[in-house]
Amino acid sequence: MTSSRGGTELERQITTGKLLATQGYVIGVEISGSGSRQSVALADLNGNILYKARRPLEYVPDTQTVLLLLDEMLAEVTAPERLRDGRILRVGVAVGGLVDSSQGVVRTLHHAQGWDNFPLQDYLVEKLDVPCIIDNNANAAALAEVESGAASPSGEEGGHKKGERIVLYVGLGRGIGGGLVANGKVYHGTTCTAGEIGHMQVKEHGPRCSCGAFGHLEAIASAQAISRTMIGLSVEYPETEAAILRVTGARAERITAEQVFQLATEGDPIAQRIIEDVYTYLGIALANIVYLINPGLIVLGGQVALAGELLIAPLQARVDSLCLPVVGQSVRIIQSKHGSEANIVGAVTLALQDV
């Protein structure tokens, strides 16, 4: 990608990867699938985040509101006092929706209206006058885990080999998305929609998904599905209802997936039923993916992955049991290193590609 500023020496250095970490900055932008969580980060050319702005909302905003907040945050992170070692060189954007990365267009956000075929790349290029790269948030997070996270080549951890050739990242948040990195490159597929594993049908006649279909993985194993199912079933079970109030400080509507895992370990039968469904249907989905692409690592991120070994150990066992030994023995399921920051770190990582 070339800049509209022309072929300066600085831009030639960008394309040849010869820039020093003090010669400028990149910006990472995160927009969630509902548009209610946005963040903008300023980073140096080593990927170190120097400053971050966030504008979380308690509701699903319209497109104009998101853009206004985005403009505010961009102005905040690019204030002159923050740019003492150069100018902004590139922007990376991680979006929680269907993205045509080749055209820089948001096809749709998964949980918000008004974003259909929105030219976000052009919008940011016009505003900042620098090159911009845009991708799905799971793809960006996958790249971040490979470049600087749990799947990076820097050392050994937990008995698995880092620097794997094929890595699958699975974001288990409000929705479920996947990002596949093969030999250091994100695999986008024919129409840039590879990795939409949340919409794999795993249970016939299962619960309704946000997309309108039934039995999708996202409707069973996403953070939102886990919390909603727990709240919905608890009304018929006073002991479970009391347990929810206890762990949430009497704010039952705020129960998290991690807290449902906690209640399951404490022996709550409703929580155990819900979590067993997560193991079953997420295990089926991952086992099928293992058969198809034979990854070395599966990295779990998002809110559900905050459950840590309460999720990972049983899920690894489930996948192992569903795969032939010769197929499944080489894959390891691990937790994201970047955690809740994976998307914004991924956006920065996008901006640094080929720099």
Could you tell me what each predicted segment is?
Residues P56-Y59, G114-W115, T193-E196:
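A short acidic/small-residue loop/turn micro-motif
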Residues M1-L89, S102-Q103, E126-V130, S148-G163, ...:
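ATP-binding/phosphotransfer module of carbohydrate and carboxylate kinases, centering on a glycine-rich
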Residues E30, G92-G96, Y169-G175, G179-V181:
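Short beta-strand segments
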Residues C132-A138, L180:
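General beta-strand structural signal in soluble alpha/beta enzymes
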